[in-house]
UniProtKB/Swiss-Prot annotation:
<dbReference type="InterPro" id="IPR004413">
    <property type="entry name" value="GatB"/>
</dbReference>
<dbReference type="GO" id="GO:0006412">
    <property type="term" value="P:translation"/>
</dbReference>
<comment type="function">
    <text>Allows the formation of correctly charged Asn-tRNA(Asn) or Gln-tRNA(Gln) through the transamidation of misacylated Asp-tRNA(Asn) or Glu-tRNA(Gln) in organisms which lack either or both of asparaginyl-tRNA or glutaminyl-tRNA synthetases. The reaction takes place in the presence of glutamine and ATP through an activated phospho-Asp-tRNA(Asn) or phospho-Glu-tRNA(Gln).</text>
</comment>
<dbReference type="InterPro" id="IPR042114">
    <property type="entry name" value="GatB_C_1"/>
</dbReference>
<dbReference type="GO" id="GO:0070681">
    <property type="term" value="P:glutaminyl-tRNAGln biosynthesis via transamidation"/>
</dbReference>
<dbReference type="Pfam" id="PF02934">
    <property type="entry name" value="GatB_N"/>
</dbReference>
<dbReference type="GO" id="GO:0050567">
    <property type="term" value="F:glutaminyl-tRNA synthase (glutamine-hydrolyzing) activity"/>
</dbReference>
<dbReference type="InterPro" id="IPR023168">
    <property type="entry name" value="GatB_Yqey_C_2"/>
</dbReference>
<dbReference type="InterPro" id="IPR006075">
    <property type="entry name" value="Asn/Gln-tRNA_Trfase_suB/E_cat"/>
</dbReference>
<dbReference type="GO" id="GO:0005524">
    <property type="term" value="F:ATP binding"/>
</dbReference>
<keyword id="KW-0648">Protein biosynthesis</keyword>
<dbReference type="Pfam" id="PF02637">
    <property type="entry name" value="GatB_Yqey"/>
</dbReference>
<dbReference type="GO" id="GO:0050566">
    <property type="term" value="F:asparaginyl-tRNA synthase (glutamine-hydrolyzing) activity"/>
</dbReference>
<keyword id="KW-0067">ATP-binding</keyword>
<dbReference type="InterPro" id="IPR003789">
    <property type="entry name" value="Asn/Gln_tRNA_amidoTrase-B-like"/>
</dbReference>
<keyword id="KW-0547">Nucleotide-binding</keyword>
<dbReference type="InterPro" id="IPR017959">
    <property type="entry name" value="Asn/Gln-tRNA_amidoTrfase_suB/E"/>
</dbReference>
Amino acid sequence: MDETVSMKCGLEIHVQVDTNSKLFCTCPTNYNEVEPNTNICPVCMAHPGARPMPPNKKAVDMAIMVAKMLGCEIVLDKDIYFQRKHYNYPDLPSGYQRTSVPVGEHGKFLGVGITEVHLEEDPGQYKPDLGVVDYNRSGTPLIEIVSDPDIKSPEEAKEFLRQLLRLFNYIGNLRGEGSMRADVNISVNYNGVQGNRVEVKNVNSIKGVYKVLKYEFIRQKNILRRGGEIKRETRAFMEAQLITKAMRSKETADDYRHIPDPDLQPIVINKEWVKTVEEKMPETPMDKEKRFVEQYGIKLEDAKVMVADLALADVFETVVSELGKEKENISLAVIWIRNELRRVLAYNNIDFLESRLKPEHITELIQLITGKTISQKIGKKVIEIMVENKGEKTPKQIIKELGLTVIDSEAVLETACKEAIENNPKAVDDYLTGNEGALNFVVGQVMRATRGRAQPNKVVEILKKLINK
């Protein structure tokens, strides 16, 4: 029997705003760097009579910026008030979470509708296995992005979140995947039978969201195939087992008893406020990709790879500016940043900022190669050494200390070539009988003998002269 199966997924993505203080008090937000329950005060501990401060302006600015960059309409000249969303859990000392009405609505990102963007406060951290709660995180500002149920596969969800995190990286002042959490809403349609929506709470990685959707799609499909009914419920992701587990029946909005917070005045966003935020908005990754292709004439794939890491994109532009914008210089910058630098960073499992290299290190390296002070092979070794020593030494210092400059003495090169010819008579005979590739082997022997300090084209020239005598 033919099956027609499809899924719909919507995401509720929570990302922390990197502010110095919490959303409604002056407590610091560096909760991971201090002892438990030290960054707290009567406000974030919900002591009787403790009144919250007006919401952190930087957090509101960031919510506006995120909404704008996701194509949302900003809610202008209307009261944006905070509500109390009631539920009982050990990490929520007040018994309610303060969450705003939408700051932005009706957006679109990568073809996925954005229902709304709003602000809320993060709860504390409850560790049920130990029975302890750390309230340092309580009150940290969060931006919540609610998508429409437009995502049709686990792969689409993974790409959507990957691109969203890249956008957060460009915006700045938003903490990345390590602090991101997503609530995953999924329903399955099996042969025309539409199942109920299931929510999987607090999935804390892109990989986790992908695994949840793969598992839930199969679980719900199998239930519907047997003629069963999908329960409308909230489930938890058991990461170790890669399964989801029922927690409780799905709440409705009424279950949370939303009421306006009487301790907080509403905020009103006007056009002037939005304009101030827009002036600080960065170029989006998609716009930067397009500009790189148009301005520098590079391939779209090269642009995508470099733009994926904002630091590398900035390095590329700096290096091109220092070398000059001639086509040859742009090509060299692409090769040494997109290929070689990324290769070494990936091998060491660090990013460019962690390497502590500077753009001028890459510029100097390329200039040493184009000036024939070092060979390309030595250039690759130098870039590896620079990353290993965290940028403490420049390329010039490295090649001087290790004696890696190009051998430009023809006499020295000729001696090395003669030895290679004498030691590899079969390869020489193969070359003389028409096998051009055999010469490459002999070139390799010369390069090995000179520790990569010979220019390959010069070696080829000398070998041909000696062999054809």
